[in-house]
């Protein structure tokens, strides 16, 4: 394991502690310009997500009206009513985004797919870097906000549903993640600069309670007037 990655893993609570758990739930308040662009404003404004830790799956509830919920896995996504009856489903969901740009509207199953893989990725980091389908490379020091951050480039195998094959996470001197860069492949490879902070500790594991995602310019700097997603997270609990 790279020394920087080891420092990051320990700063977030350690692998031994993390491996004691199988799933995680957290309450979300979600905003940003993305949802309106996709024709899905308000569907996930206030919701709870539960994700697998390691195995890739996720569920949001409520999802829109009537306390509906989603079921996400890389090869299938479904929307269910409050009693578990399937209302709509989509197999091989990623293929349905062919030709999409940032402004292309999404169907509800497409929204559920995006939200599912995104939150699974976010909540499993940085431990996801140790997944057998992820390769890690250390990059040169990155200076931002008067700090020197240590970047790690993550290259994902095709078996993992996530934003893009190559992503970068940045850790501060304390080992906690500050930033996460990726291109949203299913939205025309839109480049994103994702900032996270205001950490809390839950059963020995550190989690951010604030996430802000901006369109990234050609120089890698965020465009502050183009905040695509905001997420406030509370009431983390292992389940």
Language-model segments: which ranges?
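Short flexible/disordered coil segments
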Residues: 56-57, 78-98, 193, 198-212
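Short, solvent-exposed secondary-structure boundary motifs
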Residues: 33-44, 55-64, 120-135, 156-162, ...
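Catalytic loop of the DD-peptidase/beta-lactamase superfamily, centered on the K-T-G motif
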Residues: 62, 66-107, 216, 221-236
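Gly/Pro-enriched, hydrophobic low-complexity segments
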Residues: 146-239
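Intrinsically disordered terminal and processing segments
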Residues: 15, 65, 127-139, 223-239
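N-terminal mature ectodomain segment of secretory-pathway/periplasmic proteins
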Residues: 3, 10, 15-89, 138
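Tryptophan-centered motif/residue detector
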Residues: 18-19, 35-37, 122, 178, ...
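Flexible, processing/modification-adjacent segments and terminal tails
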Residues: 3, 81-160, 187
């Amino acid at each position: 394991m790279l020394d920087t990655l080891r420092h990051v893993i320990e700063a977030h609570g350690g692998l031994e502690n993390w491996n004691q758990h199988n799933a995680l739930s957290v309450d979300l308040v979600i905003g940003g310009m993305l949802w309106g662009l996709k024709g899905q404003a308000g569907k996930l404004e206030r919701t709870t997500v539960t994700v697998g830790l390691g195995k890739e799956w996720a569920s949001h509830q409520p999802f829109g009206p009537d306390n509906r919920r989603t079921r996400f896995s890389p090869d299938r996504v479904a929307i269910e009513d409050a009693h578990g009856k399937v209302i709509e489903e989509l197999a091989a969901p990623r293929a349905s985004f062919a030709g999409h740009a940032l402004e292309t509207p999404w169907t509800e199953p497409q929204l559920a797919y995006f939200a599912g893989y995104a939150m699974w990725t976010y909540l499993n980091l940085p431990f996801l870097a140790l997944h057998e389908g992820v390769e890690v490379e250390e990059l040169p020091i990155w200076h931002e906000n008067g700090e020197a951050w240590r970047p790690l480039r993550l290259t994902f195998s095709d078996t993992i549903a996530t934003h893009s094959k190559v992503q970068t996470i940045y850790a501060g001197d304390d080992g906690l993640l500050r930033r996460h860069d990726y291109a949203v492949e299913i939205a025309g490879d839109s480049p994103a600069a994702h900032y996270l902070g205001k950490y809390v500790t839950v059963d020995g594991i550190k989690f951010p309670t604030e996430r802000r995602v901006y369109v990234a310019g050609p120089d890698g700097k965020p465009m502050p007037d183009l905040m695509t997603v905001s997420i406030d997270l509370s009431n983390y609990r292992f389940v």
